[in-house]
């Protein structure tokens, strides 16, 4: 049976991951640790014999720079790359920039867990005169007002990620090309939920660690067979648990 592989990588630790802040569409860069995580992901993929024909990422530099570092370690810096806002992190609305633990102290752990992980729960909206509104950012100049979020739930994130998967990424894989996607915790959770037909309750508990390659294997009909992380299982579990704990009061 022919097996097709897809590699997903959540960006390495960003400066705001380090500071435990809600990031969303804010364009913050990788921390030093994040750069190291991205390089380590690339080295691991090279050791495991992976190479690619095409790459996808978001329009946010923490994902773009993660992809750069991964491809550099693979000696595939020349690889064609498509950047799309549809792979951006979920928009966290008025929470963007706030410290997660301080927000949990103010509103309670459960409310913040719902804002972070609830399937259809949207954080408080931005207003259009807020400097954080994406309509003020030139990279989104060609988007309609309807496409520009004031806030997003995971359900709304799925509404943009999955059509992009079905219309753009999957056809390329079906043509025989080997694909890597460098994106974000929630845009990747959106894709995992769809591919695994995961319940709303199941996705609530899924935490994707930074800078760890996540491999999907598909059968000849492009039905997922399995998914697994590359690397040390104990270290990966600890990183995923740390992601879950970010939204708790100190």
UniProtKB/Swiss-Prot annotation:
Keyword Protein transport listed: no
Spell out the reaction equation it catalyses.
(2R)-2-phosphoglycerate = (2R)-3-phosphoglycerate
Which InterPro entries does the record associate with it?
A: His_Pase_superF_clade-1, His_PPase_superfam, PG/BPGM_mutase_AS, Phosphogly_mut1
What superkingdom does the record give? Bacteria
Q: Where is the active site?
A: 11, 89
Record-level Gene Ontology MF annotations: phosphoglycerate mutase activity
* Known EC number: 5.4.2.11
Which residues are listed for substrate binding in this entry?
10-17, 23-24, 62, 89-92, 100, 116-117, 185-186
Pathway entry: Carbohydrate degradation; glycolysis; pyruvate from D-glyceraldehyde 3-phosphate: step 3/5
Q: Where is this site: Transition state stabilizer?
A: 184
The keyword 4Fe-4S is assigned to this record? no
Q: Which UniProt keywords apply?
A: Gluconeogenesis, Glycolysis, Isomerase
Alphabetized PROSITE patterns for the sequence = PG_MUTASE
Q: Which Pfam families match?
A: His_Phos_1 (PF00300)
One GO-annotated biological process of the protein: gluconeogenesis
The protein's matches in CDD domains, at most eight in alphabetical order, are given as: HP_PGM_like
Q: What family name appears in the similarity comment?
A: Belongs to the phosphoglycerate mutase family. BPG-dependent PGAM subfamily.
The role this protein plays is: Catalyzes the interconversion of 2-phosphoglycerate and 3-phosphoglycerate.
Mind telling me which NCBIfam families this protein's record contains? pgm_1, PRK14115.1
**Subunit info?**
Homodimer.
Q: What is this protein called?
A: 2,3-bisphosphoglycerate-dependent phosphoglycerate mutase
Organism of origin is Shigella dysenteriae serotype 1 (strain Sd197)
